[in-house]
Amino acid sequence: MTGCGSCGKIIKNIEKKYYNQLKEKDIVLVGGAVNLDDEEEVKKIMEIRKNSKVLIAVGSCAVSGGFQRMLIGLENGFPQRFVRIGDVVKVDYAIIGCPPDEEEVERIVKAVIEKDKEIVDSYLILKPYEVIAGKPIIDAYMKVNDVLLTSNKELCLGCDDKPINDEFCTGCGTCVAKCPANALTIDEKPKVNISKCIKCGTCFFNCIRVKEALLP
């Protein structure tokens, strides 16, 4: 699919390591957003879905449309052209990040292979892409609290218009440095420009405090 290629490298490494298990269980990992203007790309993702029992969307482009929606096309972007995989086919599990941590992807893939319900349920897509407000992600500027991306509210990146918890935050600035959309600035504590936020989850998964509190 369409993306910067970083998630593709991670997927390639995981597929190489777990090739036999993935093939045996018909598990496929897909990264990148779907370009609706590319007929072959749309056919490809539909064929992938048809031939797999489990489809895991890897990275923010695959899960939410990613930076293409905002950044390709410079000032205007193309939010209606580049869509998440789940807008075209059913997605079973979603791993957010721009790109996600490779060790985290491997941990989840192993859990899916081994049917470790305790781990995989946190990344299970709600039937499919069920939303809190009763509407899907169509507009790239839709408020993030309209959408619940996963079944685990603690890992959900769409549950609050103010993703920075000032009491929890140490002000280290890691999230600001990592944000691919330049939606974060820092003045003692990070500030979020919601209009620029692409809901990629990079800030969340790079936060040292979050990793300490939520991720094993």
From Swiss-Prot:
Signal peptide: none annotated. [4Fe-4S] cluster 1 binds at residues 169, 172, 175, 207. Keywords: 4Fe-4S, Electron transport, Iron, Iron-sulfur, Metal-binding, Oxidoreductase, Repeat, Transport. It comes from the Archaea. [4Fe-4S] cluster 2 binds at residues 179, 197, 200, 203. Residues 160-189, 188-216 form the 4Fe-4S ferredoxin-type domain. The keyword Metal-binding applies. Pfam families: Fer4, Oxidored_q6. One of its GO terms (molecular function) is metal ion binding. SUPFAM superfamilies: HydA/Nqo6-like. PROSITE patterns: 4FE4S_FER_1, 4FE4S_FER_2. Belongs to the FrhG family. PANTHER family: COENZYME F420-REDUCING HYDROGENASE, GAMMA SUBUNIT, F420-NON-REDUCING HYDROGENASE VHU SUBUNIT G. This is Uncharacterized protein MJ0726. It comes from Methanocaldococcus jannaschii (strain ATCC 43067 / DSM 2661 / JAL-1 / JCM 10045 / NBRC 100440). The lineage of its organism: Archaea, Methanobacteriati, Methanobacteriota, Methanomada group, Methanococci.
